């Protein structure tokens, strides 16, 4: 019981740290992307430990699906970020509204 509460607290702490990273660092898009990935990781962490506690495999499968989608989202986001850096030579968020498309 104590171990389950401890894992839930760790997952909640990871989620809150990633929210704090997004809200405090709104100028660097790379840090915001890393904080978003940490959010996905904390949600997956919570799903895995909840499914272990409930002795259900569905949470673990869903967690694997979340991690797969997060990896694809991360690679697409980094590719867009590299192209944006080559064009503007900066990765600040202030100039993002100048993008055409």
Curated annotation (Swiss-Prot):
Gene3D superfamilies: 1.10.287.3510. The chain crosses the membrane at residues 5-25, 29-49, 64-84. Its main location: mitochondrion. Belongs to the complex I subunit 4L family. The keyword Ligase does not apply. Core subunit of the mitochondrial membrane respiratory chain NADH dehydrogenase (Complex I) that is believed to belong to the minimal assembly required for catalysis. Complex I functions in the transfer of electrons from NADH to the respiratory chain. The immediate electron acceptor for the enzyme is believed to be ubiquinone. It holds the Pfam family Oxidored_q2. The keyword rRNA processing does not apply. It is an enzyme of class 7 (translocase). This is NADH-ubiquinone oxidoreductase chain 4L. Keywords: Electron transport, Membrane, Mitochondrion, NAD, Respiratory chain, Translocase, Transmembrane, Transmembrane helix, Transport, Ubiquinone. GO terms for cellular component: mitochondrial membrane; NADH dehydrogenase complex. It comes from the Eukaryota. The lineage of its organism: Eukaryota, Rhodophyta, Florideophyceae, Rhodymeniophycidae, Gigartinales. HAMAP family: NDH1_NuoK. PANTHER family: NADH-UBIQUINONE OXIDOREDUCTASE CHAIN 4L (PTHR11434:SF16), NADH-UBIQUINONE OXIDOREDUCTASE SUBUNIT ND4L (PTHR11434). Its EC number is 7.1.1.2. It catalyses: a ubiquinone + NADH + 5 H(+)(in) = a ubiquinol + NAD(+) + 4 H(+)(out). GO terms for biological process: ATP synthesis coupled electron transport. The gene is ND4L. It is a multi-pass membrane protein. It is found in: Mitochondrion membrane. One of its GO terms (molecular function) is NADH dehydrogenase (ubiquinone) activity.
